[in-house]
Each structure stands twice: as C-alpha cells, then as structure tokens.
A protein has these predicted regions:
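Aromatic/histidine-rich interaction motifs
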Residues: 159-172
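Autoinhibitory N-terminal propeptides
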Residues: 1-150, 155, 159-161, 182-211
C-alpha cells in the first residue's frame, strides 16, 4: 500500500510542478480515501488540508519540505518495525492524484465550452486559504493578482469571504487555459447571464437593480 502511494505521489508531484502557479514551491494534491480521514492532523505528514470536495475526496496543499516528509512517511508505511504517529491517516488514503483542468471546469463550462468571442468574462474561484482577512489569505490573493497582471489579465470584480474567494476576469482563450491549469484555482465558471456583480449579492432584497431575473 505504501509503495503504491509513493508511486502515486511521485507522478502527481511531477504533474503539479508543470502547472501554473503564483506561489512557486507550493503544490496542490487530490487525495482519495476510505472511511474517516483525520484532517486535523494531516500536517503530521507534511500536508495541509484545504478543501473537502466529495465524501471521500479532499484537496491538500504541500510545499517541497512537506513533500519530502510525506514521501518518507509513505515509504515507511507497512514496515513492521516502523513507529509512525497518526499512521491511520496514511492507511485511510486510497490514492493521490492532481486537481486538473477538467476538475476546474464548472458544469456550465463543460456543457457550453469557452465563449468564442476574442475577449470574455470568467468567474474564477481560488482555494479558500484560511479566512477572509488572514495574512495567509491576503498573501495568496496578492500573489495571484500579481500573476494576473504579469499575464495581462484584467480583473473586473472580486469577492473575499471566509468560505469563498472569487474573481471576475476578462480573458482571451489562451489566458483562460492558463487559469484552467493554475494550482491556486479551484473552479472556473461562466458568469450568470444576468451579469450580476458580486457587490449586488450582499444588497437588500428591496434594492435589487431592475433587469436581474
């Protein structure tokens, strides 16, 4: 079991290194597991829980140091003489994979594809690191916004809540594909046809602008 997971990790790490990033040295992995996974102690194995995506699927962050720890612990899994703290966490893991461009496509994007116009808007959700005004969240957003500027992508709107970080971006098809392969991006979606702005999501029901259906 440990050897299979080690092979999964090696392949996933290579793929993760090829993805776009605004925070060099930080990677995203997709972990499949059975039973209960003690997410509060994943850091004992060098990885940081980010998001629960399904009943038995979660996403974690890992840096190069954590990757070394994780790989070492997986290789020691199953060796009778080895004492591993929180060994049950590793035993619950069924597979290690990547969050790919297909994972990042919303239902609407998979159904309709990218718009055919030269420039178009996309709603791009980042992984919800920490909470809204936590230094780690602010650092992640700053790095992503620098990456946007470097790649000539214009931001038209942004929402930053404890459980949601989302940008509305003006892109061309090449820039859209960069976003679909960006490690900090959880989901890429087509904006609602109403054209509603994020700021309107928090307005009083009696003050909703005309024309929104």
């Amino acid at each position: 079991h440990g050897q299979k997971l080690s092979r999964d990790l090696t392949e996933s790490f290579k793929f993760a290194q090829s993805q776009q990033t605004s925070r060099p040295g930080n990677f995203v992995l997709k972990i499949r597991y059975t039973g209960l996974l003690d997410i509060t102690h994943l850091n004992k194995h060098g990885i940081e829980f980010v998001s629960q995506e399904d009943n038995h699927l979660c996403v974690v962050f890992v840096d190069e140091t954590g990757m070394t720890v994780f790989e070492d612990h997986l290789q020691r899994l199953g060796l009778d003489e080895t004492e591993l703290t929180y060994k049950q966490i590793l035993e619950a893991i069924e597979g290690i994979d990547n969050w790919t461009s297909d994972d990042r496509k919303s239902w609407a994007l998979r159904r309709h594809g990218l718009p055919r116009s030269e420039k178009f808007l996309l709603d791009v959700e980042l992984w919800p690191v920490a909470v809204a005004h936590h230094p780690e969240r602010l650092s992640t957003c700053d790095a992503f916004e620098r990456w946007l500027a470097h790649n000539g992508i214009r931001r038209t709107d942004k929402v930053n809540l404890d459980s949601l970080v989302m940008y509305r971006l003006e892109v061309n098809s090449s820039q859209a594909n960069l976003l679909l392969n960006h490690s900090d991006v959880r989901l890429v979606d087509l904006p609602p046809k109403s054209g509603i702005r994020y700021s309107q999501l928090n307005c009083d029901i009696n003050r909703i602008p005309e024309g929104i259906q």
